[in-house]
């Protein structure tokens, strides 16, 4: 048996995408700054003109899952970080948006095999959002750490699975259309 655990130092450069909701940008820009600080301190060049991190701005948190899934389907990224802020108001809108964004981000990850990190603050007040985006702590940092760890872990798991299959020279019968190391259109469940 083996034990697998992601690390925060990469031997190979990572390729990441960050999807940011523009709505509540007072909060989301602070989350992004925390995310970039973490990446830089862990050896990832966060420069948007560099070759390691792509940034995609969308109107709000509700649009984040669709874009994250589209990026994940390209299989160009080791992980995708989703940043946004949904703040409760006087109507049930908060409940609908929060639930669908959460489901959508999880589905994007499950359907593609790419870690898609849930970095959407769901809070009752703007004060709570600001506290989580830099006044008390910056969760943008935490979301970047999650992405680094999951990208590392998935690389380890893919490598181990590929090595195991190459030793037996065949894929399990349960996955007749699958290929080693990448998801094919025939094996993808949508």
Swiss-Prot record:
GO terms of molecular function: 6,7-dimethyl-8-ribityllumazine synthase activity
Catalytic reactions of this protein: (2S)-2-hydroxy-3-oxobutyl phosphate + 5-amino-6-(D-ribitylamino)uracil = 6,7-dimethyl-8-(1-D-ribityl)lumazine + phosphate + 2 H2O + H(+)
Pathway assignment: Cofactor biosynthesis; riboflavin biosynthesis; riboflavin from 2-hydroxy-3-oxobutyl phosphate and 5-amino-6-(D-ribitylamino)uracil: step 1/2
GO cellular component: cytosol; riboflavin synthase complex
Domain of life assignment: Bacteria
Signal peptide extent: none
PANTHER family from the UniProt entry: 6,7-DIMETHYL-8-RIBITYLLUMAZINE SYNTHASE, 6,7-DIMETHYL-8-RIBITYLLUMAZINE SYNTHASE DMRL SYNTHASE LUMAZINE SYNTHASE
Function: Catalyzes the formation of 6,7-dimethyl-8-ribityllumazine by condensation of 5-amino-6-(D-ribitylamino)uracil with 3,4-dihydroxy-2-butanone 4-phosphate. This is the penultimate step in the biosynthesis of riboflavin.
Protein name per its UniProtKB record: 6,7-dimethyl-8-ribityllumazine synthase
């Amino acid at each position: 048996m083996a034990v697998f655990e992601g690390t925060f130092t990469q031997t190979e450069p990572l390729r990441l995408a960050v999807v940011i909701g523009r709505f509540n940008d007072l909060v989301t820009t602070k989350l992004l700054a925390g995310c970039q600080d973490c990446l830089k301190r862990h050896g990832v060049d966060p420069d948007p003109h560099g070759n390691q991190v792509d940034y995609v701005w969308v109107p709000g948190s509700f649009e984040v899952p669709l874009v994250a899934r589209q990026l994940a389907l390209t299989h160009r990224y080791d992980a995708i970080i989703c940043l946004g802020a949904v703040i409760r108001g006087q109507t049930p809108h908060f409940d609908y948006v929060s639930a669908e964004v959460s489901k959508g981000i999880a589905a994007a990850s499950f359907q593609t095999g790419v870690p898609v990190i849930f970095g959407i603050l769901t809070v009752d007040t703007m004060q709570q959002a600001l506290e989580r985006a830099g006044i008390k702590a910056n969760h943008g940092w935490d979301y970047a750490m999650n992405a680094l760890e999951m990208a590392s872990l998935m690389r380890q798991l893919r490598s181990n699975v590929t090595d195991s299959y190459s030793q037996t020279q065949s894929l399990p019968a349960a996955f007749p259309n699958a290929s080693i190391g990448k998801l094919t259109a025939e094996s993808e469940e949508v």
